[in-house]
């Protein structure tokens, strides 16, 4: 089956999981055309749809907070069934809408499914990693637990 366009998440709701033929048959679902091998599943061209404001406007809307630039430990610190996560992060301190200082090795924790309900703004600039099939604009979230020095 060919890969086709689908909205995995829309308006904070999970619409579909991704299935290859094996798992679709096992779970009584239709394949979504996302096989990466006989047993693997991988999205192609997966991205978060852009919003309507610039990255600068998003930082101004944040005011004071943290701008995350990387997360580590996705395989060990995230529970795919419950959505709970506790991950090491790096980023920048944001004061009055301006990135002021780098911040390293802090922890962010929460629940992925709850975060979908805590999106307050999405920037208009989608970025893909080098050689990556995954992309996203900057996203402003409320209510994430953060700890560290």
Predicted regions and their residues:
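Dual-mode signal for accessory low-complexity, basic/Gly-rich regions
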Residues: 1-149
